[in-house]
């Protein structure tokens, strides 16, 4: 199985003694960064709903974005992202064999880099997939990426001999994957909290659970989609009544 997750807004830029790989869409990232660096502070604030300080930070990041970055300004993607999903993934605690498997089977969808492997070297950035950044290809990043992400995922799935993609990404990011171009069966786990017999999705918990599901798949080297139902991290249990064949639902008592 191939697994996809979203990136994170927050970064952990601690130095890592880990060999990195080059992103498949490095040239596109450079092109997009050059487009973004021409925006005014006001444009950046509006583009991503940023405060003044965050707009300045990300303007400076785009201005400093290197065409051929060295190790001093890059970090491995799965270790650099630090949001809720990555609390569940806990990439830093994966051993070398688990990380090798993740490098083949886990992908991070990115507004700037398109598709990343866990050890791909990224520069510090923030550019959400839903951003309406105008380029020669259109008025949004969805226009920019077109069917490229789908074609890349098809090819990478073919390399590992699978026709199944487990979608642990958010709707914002998986929306960049063109369904008409994608040739894979998509399974989307759903994580819900049961509060008084009324199951509901709580964003913070769901993000962390999606990362935990990705970790579960990596650590067990799962290839059979039916094995996903055995996931029980964080107190979640598979609920057959709420589930559909390609949308397994996991439920736990409300944690609030």
Curated annotation (Swiss-Prot):
Pfam families: H2O2_YaaD (PF03883). One of its GO terms (biological process) is response to hydroperoxide. GO terms for cellular component: cytosol. InterPro entries: YaaA. Coiled coil: none annotated. HAMAP family: UPF0246 (MF_00652). Belongs to the UPF0246 family. This is UPF0246 protein SPO0106.
């Amino acid at each position: 199985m191939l697994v996809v997750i979203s990136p994170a807004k927050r970064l952990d830029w601690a130095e890592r003694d880990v060999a990195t790989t080059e992103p498949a869409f490095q040239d596109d990232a450079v092109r997009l960064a050059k487009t973004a660096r021409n925006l005014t502070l006001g444009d950046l604030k509006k583009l991503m709903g940023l405060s003044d300080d965050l707009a300045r930070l990300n303007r400076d990041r785009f201005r400093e974005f290197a065409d051929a970055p060295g190790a001093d300004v890059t970090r491995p993607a799965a270790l650099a992202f630090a949001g809720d999903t990555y609390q569940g993934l806990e990439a830093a605690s994966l051993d070398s064999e688990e990380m090798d498997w993740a490098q083949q089977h886990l992908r991070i969808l990115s507004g700037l880099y398109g598709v990343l492997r866990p050890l791909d070297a990224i520069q510090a950035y923030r550019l959400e997939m839903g951003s309406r950044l105008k380029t020669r290809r259109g008025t949004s990043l969805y226009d920019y990426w077109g069917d490229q992400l789908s074609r890349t995922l098809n090819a990478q799935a073919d390399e590992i001999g699978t026709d199944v993609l487990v979608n642990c990404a958010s709707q914002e990011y998986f929306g960049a994957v063109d369904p008409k171009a994608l040739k894979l069966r998509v399974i989307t786990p759903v994580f819900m909290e049961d509060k008084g017999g009324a199951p509901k999705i709580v964003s913070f918990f769901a993000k962390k659970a999606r990362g935990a599901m990705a970790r579960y798949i990596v650590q067990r080297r799962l290839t059979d989609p039916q094995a996903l139902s055995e996931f029980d991290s964080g107190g979640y249990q598979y609920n057959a009544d709420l589930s559909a064949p390609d949308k397994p639902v996991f439920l736990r008592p409300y944690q609030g």
